Amino acid sequence: MTTRRDFLRTTSAALAGLWAGPALAAPAGPGASGGPEISLFTKHLIGLSHRELASAVARIGVASIEAPVRPGGHVLPAQVEVELPKLVEALAANGIKISMLTTGINAVSEATRTEVVLRTAKALGIQRYRMNWYAYSPDKPLWAQLDDIKPRLRDLVALSKEIGIQPCYQNHSGAKNVGAAVWDMAALMRDYRPADLAWSFDILHATVEGGLSWPNQVALARERMAMAYFKNFRWQGRVVESCPLADGLIDAGYVKMLKASAYQGPVCLHVEYLKGSVGEPGYLEKAIEASRADLATLRSWWS
């Protein structure tokens, strides 16, 4: 019986030819070990002060983070002019930078303080941000809904280009999410250069949605891949269960596929299987140890 892992290994060489073409959407230099720049998505550390966050990330052992700056994040949009510089300063004191800002932005609006958030980020040296998802409604044809997105996307890309910061879209599984299947959002992206609109590509969600065809989703996103997300999962019946990076269906074969395509951009580790929050006794140490273990796995895959 051919497993998903076997399929991944046997298709990597063939897909290398399919991927040959345009360069990365946003190339980044390699990490200190000669591998990629590795960031950490710090959602599981929300609730720490800026200094506490910087200290925890330094203990984990990465030099950059993807920082949530959205409702419920490290910094709220309403406070971004004051608090984001403080966060950047605290991180810099520990040799850490922000490689990606996670936002609630998918259109130019006062509600999300789009221009203020993006201009503040750019002024602090942040080069890219993750967009919020677009959502489907069950009450309207899908193609018509994609057409409705186009003006909002056009205005956001134009503002981002003016500011000099790159918008990135994550493929997230689920029937309501535009981009879950990749093809729909990829069709909208074709109107723009990769430097102006890119993917934060999530292999977990691609595998969940793609079944045996997920390598085609990777190939479709590859020329616009600004950052590659790493996390893992298991199926519990029909339910997706997040798990440590070493324990799920995704393995080092995916890294071989990226290497075969000459991917040299940054990668980001997501630790999404922990229960609890930083306010609970013992959680922080557990989160640091889990992050370290996943980081060691990720580095071993790239070695």
What are the residue ranges of the model-derived segments?
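Active-site acidic/histidine proton-transfer and metal-coordination neighborhood
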Residues: 11-20, 51-54, 71, 94, ...
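Hydrophobic faces of well-ordered beta-strands that scaffold small-molecule active sites
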Residues: 36-42, 65-67, 98-103, 129-131, ...
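Histidine-acidic metal/acid-base catalytic patches
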Residues: 2-37, 48-58, 125, 182-201, ...
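Glycine-rich, proline-tolerant flexible connector loops at the mouths of alpha/beta enzymes
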Residues: 68-86
